[in-house]
């Protein structure tokens, strides 16, 4: 059965979160580990693919095949300086196939595989979709997905593609700080007075500042700014560099940075220390046998951490100044400063923001980890026609984060849509030819704030040909920019004399996936999902066989039962059980069919013997004859109860040792 509504997903750099509107409120949904946020990690092993907590938990053992930070790659080029500098910190391998698109290379089931960042993000989205499905008990087909407000066109489009690959219809891409503003403002919508709210959103990998006015149910974004490459991970990097140097100093120049496992263990400890420093004045790192069997112990004070990251912390104030300038608003006119994102728990960050606003008390009324998904879930509810007293009259007016325009003679950037224009929007302008009898024009679309296109980001190009011969400046070419509510752009050009027109949806020809790529990835995703399910089914069958074998062993060793079995029967069961356990030990990665076959063989030996014993005891011919099942402590009566094969009874009863974390 398919869920009629839609879910809201906060697809984060380091953690993701999913919510749904239920019973007049947003429910943030916990995953199978009971956590309300899920690590944005995907791991590939010799036998399976792991997503979320399971992937992050094994990262130290498998650093080169555990992928995270896909959001720092999505919609970017391999040659991008940001990508090149990040690659120095990642244990997994990022390569390009010659088209300047970054792909992630891993070993999976004994083969070398490459994945696009969109595919990795789609796996995280798939995990969030499954978390929602197990809560709702229905299939989910639609979602609202959030992105940093400062994401450019190609990053937005790539995020939308990731949703498609995960089998989701992405109803809307919304900006994270705007989603957080909904979470903050939903219960204040009926206060009736206009409030200027600044959302300061510092997460694991991205940073956004958005200034909006909330008036009744109308959320109008005035300006937005940020850095798509600043967050908690950058603070972790500073700590890792600091402790790597300290290790070198204490251990005669030994450099652990060449050892990926040591580096990963150090990074995990640094992340923990950073969190500790938000509430304590100092933190201690202790790692046994970190590198070349040397134990490492070190302490760091909050003051030292603040010094290490001081420039990054102070750098967060520039976007705050820029949004106030863009909105032409004095900082004293801001009523509320709302903190979002886990990194805003850092005391120094709070202090800097508070001081900037003249010692203002910061608003911490919303959960910084969950606010974005909360807002996405509200928007998902509205977009699927949901009606509630709380959301009626809610209107989101977001803006374009960057100026959009075309290149004109001399490489000049001519703007059609200025940054911070409310979206959706449509703007047209008339251009002409540069030389006499020019048969066509080459239209290049850019985004950015600089006056020359060489300093801006090229989004895409197209040609308008078939212009009749005419002196320069005579033909009239109307260029129209249409920016939709997702912040995705389409551009058209029409020659007024002939009515000739051409258009493109900016799909960032160089960086985007083609339709064929997306279709291939959708089918790959389905294949991997089927393999995951088959792997789980094989593990269940293995556990089932093991449970059955051990419960048989316990049963025949139970004094109440042992006396009722003759030696030949007892030996037959013992031999069959020992043989099954020996086979299990040697075949940890067998197929579902093999496990089921072994189970049937074992049942074939044990069931008739136990049945005969039952009848001898006057217990009827089934497992229900004796109160509480059999005295040997067999789970749920007799597993595999005669003839029915081992269905779910023993397989699902009681905890399975293999699943304990």
Curated annotation (Swiss-Prot):
Entries under Pfam families matching the protein: HSP70
Biased composition (Gly residues): 637-648
Protein's UniProt keywords contain Disulfide bond: no
UniProt keyword list: ATP-binding, Nucleotide-binding, Stress response
One term of GO molecular function: ATP binding
GO biological process: response to heat
Positions of the UniProt region annotated as Disordered: 637-661
One Gene Ontology term, aspect cellular component: glycosome
Stated family: Belongs to the heat shock protein 70 family.
Descriptive protein name: Heat shock 70 kDa protein 4
Organism for this UniProt entry: Trypanosoma brucei brucei
